[in-house]
């Protein structure tokens, strides 16, 4: 995956998509092989926190936000570092920190919901908030797991816009089963099967690949 690229990852259940993200983020250690971030960072020699600090952020399928805190506070907590929840919320934000939060709120489309409790947001809004929480940590690479699951069509369209806007400033890898959503992202697509790359290309190339039709899209 190139710097600033948006890449979609598809494949049947058990193809290795989640395992790949687990290895990249340090949650799972492979028995053999290598895993490099850029040309010089060996992820297999790093802990999960070290990998996050190196610039890799992951958004799981189910949103994990602080439901009893406001949208603004969720973003504030995401840049807490070692201070902890209560010390962070009691501390004064400087002008740069406040502007950073405002910028992310605008990017994820929640500027009008900033004082709303996160638990009161729609499913799609929670997904956007969690992406915003990752952005507060200035990641170089974002791993996004099935963002379209459970979304309305309107939320899916907005999510396509959001993920597309992130490419360039960040590398973004999206794991997704919804082929209409993948097509809307207009990105390069990698197909995994049994832990290996089966095919790569744009959506038309992948959909017309006989191997892909046989093991995945023809199901």
Model-derived regions, located:
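The feature captures the beta-strand-to-loop junction immediately N-terminal to the Walker
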Residues: 10-12
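Helix-to-loop junction immediately C-terminal to a conserved catalytic motif
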Residues: 25
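Conserved ABC nucleotide-binding domain
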Residues: 44-45, 104-120, 125
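Helical segment within the ABC ATPase nucleotide-binding domain
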Residues: 156-168
